[in-house]
Amino acid sequence: EMLARIQNDLFDLGADLCRPDDIDGALRIVSAQVERLEQEIDAMNLKLAPLDSFVLPGGSAASATLHVARTVVRRAERLSVALASESDVNPLVIQYLNRLSDHLFQLARINNDGGAGDVLWTPGATR
């Protein structure tokens, strides 16, 4: 259900980018979509141990796939920021992509046994 809703949101987002002059706003990302992601991030965060290290992409196959999806969303966010410097972009598009990448990060951690199976970064000086 959650992923199906996000997929629908991404179609809204794509339409928003294609039609920045959409007057009636039917094909726009709206603040409620960003807020929903934030609420889900907060709920997932309550189930996870706090981090004291960076998390490397990996762990379970599902988690690794979610990490890859997160990097793709980050790239889309950077491209949207660049586009916004040249033309009109709904600021909620950029906010949504930012929150979605955090959402995918939390999902990746949950898919690694609630964060217990996270692959943590070991700094070079301590390897």
Feature locations, PLM:
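Phosphate/pyrophosphate-binding loop motifs in nucleotide- or prenyl diphosphate-using proteins
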Residues: 1-127
